[in-house]
Design a protein with these regions (language model features):
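Exported/periplasmic ABC-transporter solute-binding proteins
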Residues: 1-31, 35-45, 52-68, 73-78, ...
Length: 226
């Protein structure tokens, strides 16, 4: 079983069948915020692989002896996007437009749980507009849930992963990666894995060939880190 950060939902659901076709192994995914999955792993959830939205949570698990030695790899870098859902009347083409009166509700994943939420707020602070708009923010448990605020008409603008809204319609504004710390999508194999060979194959799949092609398709920046 693969614990995967919420931003990876669409990409992993696309690459899952490709991995199965190549290896004969059927991957089962559990998607949630990186912090929530880390907590589940600390409480002995039966995962084989953890694909996180940062490296810090894997550092934490590594220090506690919960990762298989030498199994970590940065497989991509995530891109934050501002999404104006179809039907939203907010005239937003760039982040600075969020200060306009037409933007009443902005959905963001909780920064203490989701690296993408933390990165979004970092970008807004970098632009000097966070203090002007923070009273309009509503916080979701993860970026999938933040997206749902917009899809249901309960938010005028949403900060989420570019990968989740690339094909969602509306207006998608990728946030300049220079405005926030790199989002190193990092995978590792759990020391408690009952299927370490299959886990190694999945992590390897993310680093080459068809796996990397899917990540590229969903707008991830392909990492040269390992």
């Amino acid at each position: 079983m693969i614990a995967a950060a919420a931003n990876l939902t669409d990409a992993f659901q696309t690459l899952g069948p490709k991995f199965e076709a190549e290896t004969g192994i059927h991957p089962v995914f559990s998607f949630a915020s990186t912090a929530q999955l880390t907590q589940q792993i600390e409480y002995s959830a039966p995962f084989d692989v953890f694909a996180a939205a940062d490296s810090e949570h894997l550092d934490e698990l590594d220090r506690k002896g919960l990762l298989l030695a030498g199994s970590r790899a940065v497989f991509a870098q995530g891109v934050v996007a501002l999404w104006i859902p179809p039907g939203s009347k907010a005239p937003v083409k760039r982040l600075q437009d969020l200060t306009g009166p037409e933007v009443r509700v902005i959905a963001i994943a909780k920064p203490e749980l989701a690296p993408y939420g933390d990165a979004a707020i970092h970008a807004l602070k970098s632009l000097g507009i966070w203090e002007q708009i923070k009273s309009r923010a509503v916080y979701a448990e993860n970026i999938n849930m933040a997206k749902q605020y917009g899809a249901s008409g309960n938010a005028d603008a949403v900060f989420t992963a570019y990968a989740l809204v690339l094909h969602a319609g509306g207006t998608v504004v990728p946030v300049d990666p220079a405005l926030y710390p790199a989002i190193d999508q990092t995978a590792g194999i759990l020391a408690s894995s009952e299927h370490p060979d299959a886990a190694r194959k999945f992590v390897g799949f993310l680093l080459r060939g068809a796996g990397r092609a899917v990540l590229d398709q969903y707008g991830y920046r392909l990492s040269t880190k390992r």
